[in-house]
């Protein structure tokens, strides 16, 4: 049996202790800087166009009429001289820009980051230099593989990119909701993307990996297994963007003003708690509401319930880069928090939706190369490639080098450099000596460095040794132990979800060779997992391959094993009947009670009469985090229900049954509790509430939402 990660640490003499930076004590900061505005609204307002009380104009500003083209005669051909027609059509023809190759489907929001303390003891980054300092941010969440028109709830890694508009320039953390990545070297990125994208002949399937080319690559490139396991778990189908953590993925450096550096891993920890959909629900949502995640984020911010995350770092001494049994430069590995706790630096709250999706969310252009004084790179080979690739792809999407001048990309500080011209240049430069060094302009703009002008500087501790080498570092070789640790760390229901997800994917493969290769790789992680997958696709169990089997676990990867700290923003479906005044009255009382807790309530009835929000014909259990039935609505359920032309037969029962099957809290008031009887195994199960009063039901459902999903309803492999 291979030694566990913990045993390796014990043998190496490593001491696992709490982080020395956890105290968060303020320290005197000797350099004063203007604090970046928290709201950022004044900066953006200068770019907004308000059309109230105005006339149409050309792009050149002349008033026009553009609802009819200029023709030769009443019924004649359109004239070439019709500059209004040509301008309108030409601009329309060029409205679309190249779609992002990955992360095309996304949603964004503005907010504010607030530092909890003066962190100048670990970094010279100005946005962390004082307690309470606020910095405007823009965040873009996304899926990875699908096109811009794909659904939100597909199974995928999810992007979590954050821009800090600091008072010393823009700083981007271009991360994901999963702490690791598929590959160790950026040179393999085109291969990864080509493999998971739709087939080049049929353009099928969209935003999905259940096809031969994806699993051919996964099984031939086992570095993908760790990220794949995260994606096949609940992390691949989050309940919302609000309910997922974020990670910088790469090891970076924080550097102090005097040049002392530490290795760090960035973490965003959701204040809402982690929550996930279940797979059948996610699939139905992709058809019923492909905008589910972006709508959830938009609605919550509009309601004043903008989500929050805490930003933290794991801090490691430079010399400990390989002290944990793996190499911190390997982006397919994560550092368990039991080994190095996360030091929480501050909090981000999202408060404002974009004014224009294209101008802001589509045109925002993140780059790992957007770093500021006090932050530095590591030698992670994936990171090194991303620094180049992200800049290059922005040039392609924007058609020129001036994309940083777009409003959403502009820093909130003055820009002074010798970059000139290019398509879409928006500045009028007055410096006649755009080169360095110069004497004609007094040497301006001057060079900024570690001691002058608070310039960016590379950590003095960085050094490179060794011969040129094309290949993967030997310290990156073990790509099976950490996927096993992840699998070990899931509760049984989550393990079953992961097994079922892989079964779903593998059962769609056509190639027997790819199936066999996949089982071989799974078996190197877990014989239990490989055996359970093999049973579904008709293969015999494999003998254990124990070289990388470890009993190591971590407490920080499970989703369903912990109660949520907040239920604000969840939605409860209240099933009522417009033919019963008691039902509608109870529904209104429940809605008021839920609203007081920050929970959305949707009253569903046969028609949109006063007191209802949605009809049964359009309602579905996927839209609700819990479902309750009011007294009087029981007549719409089961054998007593009369045929109704206002909604599909059995729809009220279907909503309740689906909610129960997907582990959601369900309940009913008094006589309506009869509708719960047909649900399988509900007599003593948690999350099923039979109560006599409206207040009791509201309290019970709110408590049940803290559990979120009652996973004991899902069967386990025997």
Curated annotation (Swiss-Prot):
Cofactor(s) the record lists: heme
Superkingdom of the source species: Eukaryota
Pfam families: Catalase, Catalase-rel, Catalase_C
Catalytic residues in the record: 103, 176
Reactions mediated catalytically: 2 H2O2 = O2 + 2 H2O
EC number, as in UniProt: 1.11.1.6
Keyword Oxidoreductase among UniProt keywords: yes
Listed SMART domains: Catalase (SM01060)
Keyword annotations from UniProtKB, A to Z: Heme, Hydrogen peroxide, Iron, Metal-binding, Oxidoreductase, Peroxidase, Peroxisome
Family classification: Belongs to the catalase family.
The protein's name in its UniProt record: Catalase
């Amino acid at each position: 049996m291979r030694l566990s990660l913990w045993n390796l640490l014990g043998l190496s003499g490593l001491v696992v202790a709490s982080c020395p930076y956890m105290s968060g004590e303020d320290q005197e900061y000797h350099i004063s800087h203007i604090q970046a505005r928290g709201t950022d609204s004044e900066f953006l307002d200068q770019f907004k166009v308000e059309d109230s009380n105005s006339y149409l104009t050309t792009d050149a500003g002349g008033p026009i009429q553009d609802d009819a083209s200029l023709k030769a005669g009443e019924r004649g051909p359109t004239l070439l001289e019709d500059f209004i027609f040509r301008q309108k059509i030409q601009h329309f023809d060029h409205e679309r820009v190249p779609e992002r190759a990955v992360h095309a489907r996304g949603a964004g929001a503005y907010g504010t980051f607030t530092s909890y303390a003066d962190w100048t003891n670990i970094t010279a980054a100005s946005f962390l230099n004082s307690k309470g300092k606020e910095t405007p941010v823009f965040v873009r969440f996304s899926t990875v593989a699908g096109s811009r028109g794909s659904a939100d709830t597909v199974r995928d890694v999810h992007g979590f990119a954050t821009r800090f508009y600091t008072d010393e320039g823009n700083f981007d953390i271009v991360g994901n909701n999963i702490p690791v990545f598929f590959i160790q070297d950026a040179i393999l990125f085109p291969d990864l993307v080509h493999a998971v994208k739709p087939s080049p002949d049929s353009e099928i399937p969209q935003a999905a990996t259940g096809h031969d080319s994806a699993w051919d690559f996964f099984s031939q490139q086992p570095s993908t297994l760790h990220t794949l396991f995260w994606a096949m778990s609940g992390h691949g189908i989050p309940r919302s963007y609000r309910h997922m953590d974020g990670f910088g993925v790469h090891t970076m450096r924080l550097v102090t003003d005097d040049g002392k550096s530490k290795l760090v891993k960035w973490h965003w920890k959701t204040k809402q708690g982690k929550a996930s959909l279940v797979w059948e629900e996610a699939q139905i949502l992709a058809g019923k509401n492909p905008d589910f995640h972006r709508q959830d984020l938009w609605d919550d911010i509009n309601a004043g319930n903008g989500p929050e995350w805490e930003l933290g770092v794991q801090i490691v001494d430079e010399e400990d880069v390989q002290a944990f049994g793996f190499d911190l430069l390997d982006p397919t590995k994560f550092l368990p928090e039991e080994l190095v706790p996360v030091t929480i630096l501050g909090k981000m709250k999202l408060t404002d939706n974009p004014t224009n999706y294209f101008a802001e969310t589509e045109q925002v252009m993140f780059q790992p190369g957007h770093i500021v004084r006090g932050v530095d790179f590591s030698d992670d080979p994936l990171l090194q490639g991303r620094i180049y690739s992200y800049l290059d792809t922005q040039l392609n999407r924007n058609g020129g080098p001036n994309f940083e001048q777009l409003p959403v990309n502009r820093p909130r500080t003055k820009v002074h450099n010798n970059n000139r011209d290019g398509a879409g240049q928006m500045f009028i430069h007055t410096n006649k000596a755009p080169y360095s060094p110069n004497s004609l302009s007094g040497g301006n703009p001057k060079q900024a460095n570690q001691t002058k002008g608070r310039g960016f500087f590379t950590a003095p501790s960085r050094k490179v040794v060794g011969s040129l080498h094309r290949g993967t570092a030997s310290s990156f070789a073990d790509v099976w132990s950490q996927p096993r640790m992840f699998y070990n760390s899931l509760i049984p229901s989550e393990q079953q979800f992961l097994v079922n997800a892989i079964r779903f994917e593998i059962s769609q493969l056509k190639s027997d060779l790819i199936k066999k290769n996949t089982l071989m790789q799974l078996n190197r992680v877990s014989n239990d997992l490989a055996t359970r997958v093999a049973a579904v696709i008709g293969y015999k169990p494999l003998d254990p391959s124990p070289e990388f089997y470890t009993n190591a676990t971590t407490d920080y990867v499970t989703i369903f094993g912990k109660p949520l700290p907040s239920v604000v923003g969840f939605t409860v479906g209240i099933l009522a009947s417009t033919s019963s005044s008691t039902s509608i009255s109870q529904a209104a009382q429940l809605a008021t009670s839920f609203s007081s807790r920050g929970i959305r309530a949707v009253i569903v009835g046969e028609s949109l009469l006063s007191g209802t929000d949605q009809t049964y014909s359009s309602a579905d259990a996927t839209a609700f985090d819990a479902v309750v039935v009011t007294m009087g609505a029981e007549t719409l359920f089961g054998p007593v229900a009369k045929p109704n032309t206002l909604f599909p037969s059995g729809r009220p029962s279907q909503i309740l049954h689906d909610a129960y099957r997907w582990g959601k809290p369900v309940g009913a008031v008094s006589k309506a509790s009869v509708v719960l009887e047909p649900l399988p195994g509900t007599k003593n199960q948690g999350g099923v509430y039979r109560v006599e009063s409206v207040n009791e039901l509201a309290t019970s459902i709110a408590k049940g939402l803290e559990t979120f999903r009652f996973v004991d309803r899902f069967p386990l492999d025997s």
